[in-house]
Amino acid sequence: FSYAWMALLQAICRNGDKAEYYLTLFQDVFTGPNGFHLNGDFKQKGVSRYTYRPFTLEANFLAAEAIQHMLIQTEGMAFEVLPAVPASWKGKRLSCFDFRTDNGLQISVMRDDCNHVLVRCQAIYAGEWVFRNLNQTFSLNAGQVKTFSYCA
């Protein structure tokens, strides 16, 4: 669990390079061919003294959450897209679709290789939100859509 937890903590702290490092380590050392988290360093890479192979899935969910926090973060009614993108992802196409946030939005993000970003927000319920990337406040009724476009 440690490496997936560290990836999540680094993503929350907006440190994309470190989040990517821990996700890569988790994938390379603690993930089996079938994608399951193997609790020990069964590949014997030297990062754990435990080398057994019992598997669990909880750390996989942590890793997935770390990736989501690299792409979208919320705090109250505010949100930010691509807050923890590692340097290795810059200048590359990137997209995520219909992420449902805990503040009542369904968000899709598309970034092209020239760093042009398109953000689509659909309200799950009526409310007022702050899009931190552009420091813009907006209101929507349930089902309404707001689109933002900018260069990162």
Where are these regions (language model features)?
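Alpha-helical support elements that line or immediately flank enzyme active sites
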Residues: 3-16, 70
